[in-house]
């Protein structure tokens, strides 16, 4: 699996370099779920596909920007699912964005998730790698990823990052969010899931939520290459996740590679409070 991680690092570095002079315009194409693709979405996907295709340990790849699974080496063990550029719609305002990766063994499902990674393209290039404990790495002047620290969630946080169009929220969710603000929580929502999860993780706690809404009853975030890898990282850091019903997002099973789900990530206090609010 270390070979797979090494190739992911190469792809992340190439994307980071390309971001220095990006084309932020939209293409004429849409991805499988109907999102209009930025030209840099397509370029990032091409970079990752090209790089991971050179790794003999990868059986197949699944991308947010591809309609179907792409088989690379049937004799290999690992399947890599990824969002090549999460938050790409924020490129024109120069917000921090990132890439998300899940490494599955033999079959793509949460039970077979062996490692998860995400990169942050911000003021500096950082990479979080998680097999057992999430570890933060930072690119140095020699183009090497240097270990910075292990990441761990506190029992309770102060950050409230809540997505979904508010007018379409269910009453129970609106009430839950209001109660958090009444407790003194701070709104921190950028529109890039990876950036918001990263802030909660590095600050040690809080909650990220993207609930079921009237216009998206199954949520909008994709299980295999967004929800599962970030849930894996949060839970390995001591946090909790749920879809509002299950005790963990990693209990969920889906047949379609572009399946979506409501999702909540956070410290133990916030997720326990949410489950109570959702099941009263």
Swiss-Prot record:
Q: How the cofactor binds, per note?
A: Binds 2 magnesium ions per subunit.
Keyword Hydrolase listed? The answer is yes
Top-level taxonomic group:
Bacteria
Q: Where does substrate bind?
A: 86-89, 189, 220
Q: Which residues bind Mg(2+) 2?
A: 83, 86, 226
The compartments listed are:
Cytoplasm
Q: Name one GO cellular component term.
A: cytosol
Q: Which InterPro entries match?
A: FBPase_C_dom, FBPase_class-1, FBPase_N, FBPtase, SBPase
* Pfam family name, one: FBPase_C
Biological process GO terms, please? fructose 1,6-bisphosphate metabolic process; fructose 6-phosphate metabolic process; fructose metabolic process; gluconeogenesis; sucrose biosynthetic process
What this protein catalyses is: beta-D-fructose 1,6-bisphosphate + H2O = beta-D-fructose 6-phosphate + phosphate
EC assignment: the record states 3.1.3.11
Keywords, in A-Z order: Carbohydrate metabolism, Cytoplasm, Hydrolase, Magnesium, Metal-binding
Needed cofactors, names only, are:
Mg(2+)
A GO molecular function for this record? fructose 1,6-bisphosphate 1-phosphatase activity
Q: In which pathway does it act?
A: Carbohydrate biosynthesis; gluconeogenesis
Q: Does the keyword Membrane apply?
A: no
- Residues recorded as binding Mg(2+) 1, renumbered to this chain, are 64, 83, 85
Recorded family membership: Belongs to the FBPase class 1 family.
Spell out the subunit comment.
Homotetramer.
Q: What is this protein called?
A: Fructose-1,6-bisphosphatase class 1
Q: Could you tell me which species this protein originates from?
A: Campylobacter jejuni (strain RM1221)
